[in-house]
Amino acid sequence: MKLGMARGEVCLRVSAILVLVLTACLVALDTQTKVVFVSIEKKATYKDLNALKILVYVTCAAAGYNLLLLCKHSIWSRKNFKGSYLCMAWICFSLDQIAVYMTFAANTATMGAAVLAISGSEAFQWLKVCDKFTRFCVEIGGALLCGYAASMLMALISTISAYKVFRMYSPKWFLRLKSA
């Protein structure tokens, strides 16, 4: 069971890294140039919207974190590590939770900004940007789908981390470690 769970966690982490990198690349490399007025060109990039910049930073950080944990897993699987497994399990569980929530929050904030770009807001006199930059908006939508898929993968990873932490505690006594 432990070997199967370890393989599953590695597969989930690799999948999450790939989807997170795909999300960051889709957002960061997405540009579209349109002629706005006779000879004036406007270029839409991810730098035009702070939510898109934050999404790129958060997804890159989450991918890096998952890559570090893959390295930790490969080092610990080769050597017989006799450290505080409980402490490391709690740290990994907490960081997994933070990574999931940050990725989900960045995707949701970007989704809110994307809705404003699609529909505009007459009260704030914001124009519908996606009428002019359709391809840009479609690619950002694809990136958001990838981002939410990555959030779901990382939530599954977090459940495995939770299992690793709480299996060490006694089912009969509240927060008491199992006796060896």
Swiss-Prot record:
Alphabetically sorted, this entry's keywords are:
Cell membrane, Membrane, Transmembrane, Transmembrane helix
Protein topology in the membrane: Multi-pass membrane protein
The reply to whether Transmembrane helix figures as a keyword in the UniProt entry is yes
Q: Name one Pfam family in it.
A: CASP_dom
| Localization in the cell | Cell membrane
Query: Which ranges of this chain reside in the Cytoplasmic compartment per its record?
Result: 1-8, 72-97, 161-180
Fetch the InterPro entries from UniProt: CASP/CASPL, CASP_dom
Q: Which GO terms describe its cellular component?
A: plasma membrane
Q: Which residues lie on this side of the membrane: Extracellular?
A: 30-50, 119-139
Spell out the subunit comment. Answer: Homodimer and heterodimers.
Q: State the name under which the record lists this protein.
A: CASP-like protein 2C1
**What organism is listed for this UniProt entry?**
Glycine max
